[in-house]
Amino acid sequence: MIEINVYYKKWYSTIKKPKIFVKNVIKSSLINLNIYEYKPIISIVLANNILLQKLNYEYRNKNKPTNVLSFPYDKLNKKCNLGEIFLSLDTLIEESIDLNIPIEHHTCHMLIHGLLHILDYNHEEPLMQYIMESIEIKLLDKLGIRNPYVSRETIYP
């Protein structure tokens, strides 16, 4: 089950039908990762810089906003609560403008990035970063979105 909370109403004027958009990205990713049949519970909060900065400071001791934060809960099994993903629309818009890419594409990328974190992937070491980015590229390609790493440095929270 995918639970989506639109905390920041500006999402509605930026992404067409944001709840459906997010649900489709997560569902596609779970299917392509061959884990949709597990029916995991995933909570997604569509937020802003104010909330993400507060959470980033509280949980990571970084007093600045970020694009995505993930909070993993359970390991993958039937109907487990995988965790929460928080996205900041403000930061995603800024980054999309800087990268000259559609906000929808960057949002897909950061949703997938957050999903992989709650599935226990990380980018702390070069090999893990390579694995995680390779999966992101594959999942984005399934959505018709080009490789985000071709012409830029990696953006991580």
Curated annotation (Swiss-Prot):
Entry cofactors: Zn(2+)
Q: Which protein are we looking at? A: Endoribonuclease YbeY
Q: What does this protein do?
A: Single strand-specific metallo-endoribonuclease involved in late-stage 70S ribosome quality control and in maturation of the 3' terminus of the 16S rRNA.
Q: Which SUPFAM superfamilies match?
A: Metalloproteases ('zincins'), catalytic domain
Q: What is the species listed in this Swiss-Prot or TrEMBL entry?
A: Ehrlichia ruminantium (strain Gardel)
Q: Which gene encodes it?
A: ybeY
Q: Name one GO molecular function term.
A: metalloendopeptidase activity
Top-rank lineage group of the source organism: Bacteria
Any one GO CC term of the record: cytoplasm
- Tell me the cofactor note: Binds 1 zinc ion.
Gene Ontology terms: biological process = rRNA processing
UniProt entry keywords in alphabetical sequence: Cytoplasm, Endonuclease, Hydrolase, Metal-binding, Nuclease, Ribosome biogenesis, rRNA processing, Zinc
Q: Does the keyword rRNA processing apply?
A: yes
Binding annotation for Zn(2+): H113, H117, H123
| Location(s) in or outside the cell | Cytoplasm
Q: Does the keyword Metal-binding apply?
A: yes
What InterPro entries does its record include?
MetalPrtase_cat_dom_sf_prd, YbeY
Q: What class of enzyme is it?
A: hydrolase
EC number(s) stated in the UniProt entry for this protein: 3.1.-.-
The similarity comment for this entry is: Belongs to the endoribonuclease YbeY family.
Q: What is its main location?
A: cytoplasm
